[in-house]
A protein has these predicted regions:
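Oxidoreductase and adenylate-handling cofactor-binding alpha/beta cores
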Residues: 96-112, 137-140, 267-276
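Short, well-ordered coil/turn residues at beta-beta hairpins
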Residues: 6, 43-44, 65, 171-174, ...
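Glycine-rich adenosine-cofactor-binding loop
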Residues: 7, 88, 96, 115-136
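N-terminal glycine-/charge-rich "phosphate-binding" loop or analogous flexible N-terminal tail
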Residues: 1-38
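Rossmann-like dinucleotide-binding domain for NAD(H)/NADP(H)
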Residues: 199, 205-349
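Rossmann-like adenosine-cofactor binding region
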Residues: 49-50, 149-241
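NAD(P)-binding Rossmann-fold cofactor-contacting core
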Residues: 10, 137-154
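Phosphate/diphosphate ligand-binding glycine-rich loop within oxidoreductases
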Residues: 39-112
Length: 349
């Protein structure tokens, strides 16, 4: 079996070698000529998997080691009989810990009060559910908005208007969809900002195009929102530098980039390929966790407080500072991202 693999997928080489011949290429450069004689692809979001790439190839299986799959032409896959899979939930806890750390920093800067604040979670799938669990442990009141789940008759959800009326923080965890009953493309637009009541903080760790960045810049300038934390950008890998300078934190699409989340995605993608071809492999092993060496201690909490411990473990300001210093290096900052383990000890936070 011959597998073409994005060379930035971590923790994969030893395991992939057990499946067959593995060829590693830059994800954005994988071409039709490269995949013509491949049996499977393991990719990330930078590889567009469609007719132009796959027609005439012998590819039977495409696995993306990511939650998102808008880079995969699923209609073509079905038409061509090519199996495909994504990795739902692989980095859910990583994104949730990013949001948690960002909220602690926002509280330390006086933008929010963690005690009793109301958080609106827009999109309550794997990631949104993990965010909900962590924030409930912090004592936050949660309002949940997820129209597809609500349409299936599930309970405990509110309309977007309730989010706009009552929330001090709104955090986005939707997929990017352009069609269907509940499209998310530019769902956060000028009309959304005009209907806000409480000058909330906006967090986008979902997909960049869920937010109309022009409207977001206007909302920041006019004070319709207090500030923003942006991890995903509308025109990635190009970052709007004016917006980057205006937000509280701006990071290079790394909320889900913990080593644990990456390894989960790698393992799930390899498992899908192995199942499809009736083979097996040994799962990758992660190195031990290390404290973040970013020198920051929150003013509002003692060094022994669990929130201080969480920030010592991972402080997103490091990633924000790196992007502000070199916004042109968006892809490099992602590709060369340092080891970051999830803090399993925060189960009690």
């Amino acid at each position: 079996m011959r597998i073409i693999i994005d060379d930035k997928i971590p923790f994969i080489r030893e395991a992939a070698a057990q499946l067959g011949e593995a060829v590693y290429l830059s994800g954005s450069d994988i071409s039709a000529a490269d995949v013509r004689d491949a049996d499977a692809l393991i990719v990330r979001t930078r590889t567009r998997c469609d007719e132009a790439l796959l027609q005439g190839s012998r590819v039977q299986m495409v696995a993306t080691a990511t939650i998102g799959y808008d880079h995969i032409d699923t209609a073509y896959m079905q038409h061509a009989g090519v199996a495909w899979t994504n990795c739902p939930g692989c980095n859910a806890d990583s994104v949730a810990q990013y949001v948690q750390s960002a909220l602690i920093l926002l509280a330390d800067a006086g933008h929010v009060d963690l005690a009793g604040m109301t958080v609106g979670i827009v999109g309550v799938g794997h990631v949104g559910s993990s965010v909900e669990r962590m924030l409930r442990r912090m004592g936050c009141r949660i309002l949940r908005h997820d129209p597809p789940r609500q349409a299936r008759g599930e309970e405990g959800f509110v309309d977007l208007e309730e989010i706009q009326k009552h929330c001090d923080v709104i955090t986005l965890h939707t997929p990017l969809t352009r069609e269907g009953a509940h499209p998310t493309f530019h769902m956060i637009d000028e009309q959304f900002f005009d209907a806000l009541h409480r000058r909330p903080v906006l967090i986008n760790a979902a997909r960049g195009e869920v937010v109309d960045e022009a409207a977001l810049k206007t909302a920041l300038k006019t004070g319709k929102i207090r500030t923003a934390v942006i991890d995903t950008w509308e025109h990635e890998p190009c970052v709007d530098r004016e917006l980057l300078s205006a937000v509280f934190l701006g990071t290079p699409h790394i909320a889900g980039y913990s080593a644990d989340g990456k390894a989960n995605g790698t393992r799930m993608a390899l498992q899908a390929v192995a199942r499809h071809f009736g083979t097996s492999f040994s799962a990758p092993v992660l190195p031990p966790a290390l404290p973040d060496d970013y020198a920051y201690y929150p003013q509002r909490y003692s060094p022994q407080h669990p929130y201080a411990e969480l920030l010592r473990h991972y402080d997103p300001r490091r990633d924000s500072d790196a992007l502000r210093a070199h916004p042109e290096d968006f892809e490099r900052l992602r590709g060369d991202y340092p080891l970051r383990r999830e803090m399993q000890a925060n189960d009690g936070i």
